[in-house]
Amino acid sequence: MRDGGLMKISRALPRMSWHPKNLYNLFLRTVDSKNDHRRAITFGDNSIRSLFQERWVSKTVVRAYHGDHINEKIFKQWYLPDYLPDVRPRRKVFGDDKASLQEFAKRRQREKALEEEEQTKGLAPIGSLMFAEVERRLDVLIFRSCFAPSVYEARRLVVHGNVLLNGKRHYNANTRLAPGDMFSVKPSAMRILQPQREKGESDNVIDHPDAPPELTPFNLPFYASPWLFIPAYLEVSFATCSAIYVRHPTARPQYSEVPTPYGADGEVIRHAWEWYMQNRPRKRTESQWSKMPDDRLRRQMEELRLGRNSLKLATSGI
């Protein structure tokens, strides 16, 4: 771990980790404590904080979980989206000549039923999509695939050359993957697949003396079950220790694919978004674009654009 104070209970900041202290910190942040105003995140009339303090606290707790190992300046410049998608229903206005045809075809009734269903379900929680670019990072995807007990361990696996990206050894943990990319982790480098050193290190304390010696050991850390889930945008194969980044995370009514310990469209995420909208870089120069972290999707788009330009030049010369 790069910093011993990451899991301090006095700070109570949830991280991307399976550590037991991290689960307790998550409990302290998600359960409202009336006696501890420093840990409880309250808004509105019952809050003792100003609007600036509410936004600052929201930004702090949100960034502690979503990419705390990313420099704040780099996060605001390259990982923060320019805007969030608009999910408000678009009302259609038709002329008098089309109204009679729609009533005849019963399209208006179907549209009304869809609008009522949309109002019942509510709008999609898009607030958590502000961290969609962070979810594309290779180290974060390794943690989401449950191949590493923390995002810091996942970063160590990449830096030490234990990860293959599309069949080639990859050392850059900052790489953002494109849909269709496949990454694999070396099983011998995964700590959960190593022999148990001490009796109290794992929940897997049942001995099987009759088991063949060639079976791979599996030692699950204590209190890891709340973090064992796979997002919908990943296709994971535990038999081969590999996964495919299928598509970008999205959201639909009452569901967001970006995992977060806070409400996907709650006040914490909203206040954090308001903070970044007021404190973000205004533009990117050519020199700044050259310093951008590795993005495979942007690289593929540039290669496609160059291929189209070369094709146009080749056809124009014929």
Predicted regions and their residues:
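Ferredoxin-like alpha/beta domains used as RNA- or RNAP-binding modules
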Residues: 1-145, 172-318
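Contiguous, well-ordered alpha-helical segments that form the cores/surfaces of helical PPI scaffolds
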Residues: 139-144, 156, 160-162
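Active-site metal-coordination segments of metallo-dependent hydrolases
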Residues: 151, 170-173
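Short, well-ordered loop/turn sites that connect or cap secondary structure elements
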Residues: 151, 157-158, 163, 177
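Short strand-turn-strand beta-turns centered on an Asx-Gly dipeptide
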Residues: 165-167
